[in-house]
Structures are given as structure tokens and as C-alpha cells.
Amino acid sequence: MSSHTSTPNHASAAPPRKWYDMTSAEFYVYVVAFMCGISMLMPINAVFSAPSYMLQYYLYATKDPNHVPQMTNFWSNVMTYYNLIGLVTGLVMEPLTLLKSFRKIPMLVRLLGGLCILIVEIIVLMAVPARGTTEGGAVATMCIAGFIGGLGKSIFESTVYGMFGAFPPSFTSIMMGGVGISGVLTSLIQIIVKAALPDTYEGVKKQSYIYYSLDVGIQAATFIALIMMRFNSFAQLHFGDLGGVKSKVDAGSLAGAGENVREPGAEATELEQYTEPAIGQIQEKNAEAHKDDPLVDREHSDDVDEHGDALRAVEGPTSNEILRATSIISVLRSIKWMFVSCAFVFVVTLFLFPGIATGMFPESKWFATVAVFIFNCCDVLGRVAPALRFMWPRSYNQRWIIVAASFARVIFVPLLLLYSYHYIPSEAYGYVIMVIFGFSSGYVASMSLTLGPQSKGIDNDGKRFVAGTLMGISILVGGTIGTVLSIMTQTIREKY
């Protein structure tokens, strides 16, 4: 490759594309990315949106509204334990998805399998109370459901992050927006349902059925949308057909990444490197990159031009072969700072939220509900902020700003701990701090997840997929550490 390709040429870079230039196939992939984001956290959001049902699950499992619990510590912290079981399961399982044996499984199978497991999680939570069991059985059910949820989430999440890591960065931003919308949607429904139904034994049961039915419906819609995406031309251009057939992009190509073609490791110094050309421009760029390559099948290319099928111009290895040939360690070295940034965001967020951040007014019927809703709304605003160009670092070398912002969020620890001890007794303070806390969490996490697969040295689809998967693991690492710290802190507070 000639030396001029390693230096960004902004004059020749494709201009930003207008929304009306988007093809229907590309729009459909955006919709699927959004739906995948919603589905990713919908089960845990549905569970957390019915806290009364979870905190008193033993009443419904035993079918006894007057049952006196024997395992009081477990039920007092059931939400935290449930979340921790899922996180630990994911922390163990998600790295296993990077094994070569697992990477042989077609992506579509992984996606649909993960969704099915997440649906089973909700079915278990609803089926056991329908048949009835003991309090011990209720505890076992919660642990099993948490494990099932963690297993399904690890498979689905790692594949989604990896898959959309191979697409232009705006798809990751849209997917992250869906993750945030999932929380907003469940919080909004929680407020409506809480106002409409009484907090009685039967009222709480109806509330839980509403949340869980919504979850299953969304998962089913995503299931169908993913099956249809297998036949989507835009998806095929970026990562085969999700089923393990020949990829339409060769293993070393940068086509579809929304970047200028450059040598591996060449530094992308300006924001314009992330602009996304139209499909035709991608194909022209790919052809230009290979025009001097003697290995390219000229006769095949001429035949493709004759039939007008640009998607078959370069037929590379299968998407699974690309994945198996990718070095995990080298990818981790390339994304290490974005990995650390993303992990630390979730250390702080899950250390403080929801337990410490919303538990200071237990006698208030609405404080926790409204605080969670505000957090979720601001979180989704932060997650979609990277869709705005001015919210990105101005150059590649300014990525340190995202890492610094991640570590700067540690300031929320003393602010919210002091608030939880009522040194600042105002509920209004809690609402205001949730605005900043939620937006910063969503923005820094989304930017880290978006920039990770766009790092130096991540120069083909296989590396982008692995980078996206590793960024998903960073969420689990940070979330697990934060949740453990939260449990330890709240246990100490109960004793002292």
C-alpha cells in the first residue's frame, strides 16, 4: 500500500451523509440495532420495575399473603443479589464466547439463542408462583432465574456488541440509545401502573404481569427482526449474512467501517475519520483499495459489474473464519484505555445506583420511582449524545478526555454517600444529582463503547467484532465490582 494512504486526506474523505440518502436496508439495520439495545436490558429492567413483587416474591411463591419470611437478609437485599448473580454469571460466561470453539457458532444462532434464554428467565419467575413452592424454593427460583438471565444476557450482549462493532460507529450509538430507552420505558410504565393499581397483594401481582408481558413481547419482536436481517443487503455488506456463509467483505478490508482506508495502526487524527459514506462510496473505496492487488479475481469482478451486483465483488472468508483468525490479546492491547474507561463507569454507577442513590427516603412512596425515572431519562440522553458530532473528541489523541471523565465520576461517591446519610436532607437535591449522574453515566459509557472498536490497529471486521465483545466484558467487570462494593457498603451500614 502506498504511503499516502496512511495519512488522512480530509479533502477526499466522503462528506457526511444526510438522513434522506439512507437506503431502506440501512434504515432497517438501525431499527434492529435499536431493538437489540432495548432487548439487552429489558428483562432486568422489567424485574427492577416491579420491586415490590421481587421483595415479597416469597408471598407469591408460597401463595400465602401472610407468610412471615425466615431468610430476612436475602429478601431485604434480593434485588442486589439477583443483579450480582447475573453479573457474575455473565463475567464467567462472556469471556468464554471468545473461545474459538464458540466463535464457530453462527452469529444468528447466538443472537436467537441468547434471546430465547432471556425469555426463559421471565417464564421461570412467573411459572413458579403459579404452581406454588416453599420459601426455600422461592430463594432457589430467584437464584436460578438470575443465573439464566446472566447466561442469556452474556451470549446476546457479547454478540450484539461485537456485531455492531463491525458496523459504522453510529450503529453502536443507536444500539446504546436503545439500552437507555429500555430503562426509560419500564420506568414510565412503572409510574403509570403504580398510580393506577393499588400496592396490595393482587395489585402488585398484576403490576409484575404487565412488566413481564411487555418484556416477552419486545423480545419476540426482536427475535423476528433478527431473522429478517439475515437477508438484509446492508448487513451482508458488513458482516456476511450472520449465518456463517462467505462474508461480502474480505478479512483485511475496512469497508463499511466509515473510515478512510489506511494501513493497520495508522492514526486517525480527526473526527472526520468517523464520517460514514453511502453504500456506493463504500464499494468504490473497497474497489480502489484492491485495484493493484494481483490476487483479486478480475474476471469475477467484471462479471459482477455486468450483472450489477456489487455485493459479490469481493468474496472473502466466512465471518466465523475471520473471527477465529483474530488475536484477542492484540485487540485488547489496542482498546485497553476504552476498556478501562467503560469498566470504571459501571463501577461507580452500580456501586451507587440504585441502592445507595435511591434508598435514602424509604418512607416515601414516590422518591425512588421518580429518581430512577430521572436517572434513566438522563442516561438515555447521554447514550445518544455521541450521535452529535460536537460531542466527540476533536482528534484521536484527545480520547484521554473520555478516560478522564470516567475517573472524574468518582466525585459522585462522597456526594451520594453524604446524601444517603441525610447530611443533605432535601429530596430536590436527589433529583438534581440524578440528572448529572445519569447523563454522565450514559455519555461516557456510550463514547467508550463506540470508540473502542475504532481504535488504532482495529482494522478489519473480525477485530471489530472481538473489540465490541471485549467492551461488553468491560461492562460486566465494572458492574460486578460496583455491585460487590454496594453490597459490602450496605452491609456495613446496617451493622453500624
Curated annotation (Swiss-Prot):
The keyword Transmembrane is assigned to this record: yes
Its membrane topology: Multi-pass membrane protein
Pfam families, per the entry: Nucleoside_tran (PF01733)
Known outcome of mutating K153T: Decreases affinity for adenosine
Annotated transmembrane regions: 27-47, 78-98, 108-128, 136-156, 173-193, 209-229, 337-357, 366-386, 400-420, 432-452, 465-485
Entry's localization field: Membrane
The entry's keywords: Membrane, Transmembrane, Transmembrane helix, Transport
Cytoplasmic side: 1-26, 99-107, 157-172, 230-336, 387-399, 453-464
Gene Ontology molecular function: any one: nucleoside transmembrane transporter activity
Outcome after substituting I481V: In AT1.2 allele
Residues exposed to the Extracellular side: 48-77, 129-135, 194-208, 358-365, 421-431, 486-496
Highest rank taxon of the organism: Eukaryota
UniProt-listed PANTHER family: EQUILIBRATIVE NUCLEOSIDE TRANSPORTER (PTHR10332), EQUILIBRATIVE NUCLEOSIDE TRANSPORTER 4 (PTHR10332:SF10)
Entry's family note: Belongs to the SLC29A/ENT transporter (TC 2.A.57) family.
Protein name: Adenosine transporter 1
Organism: Crithidia fasciculata
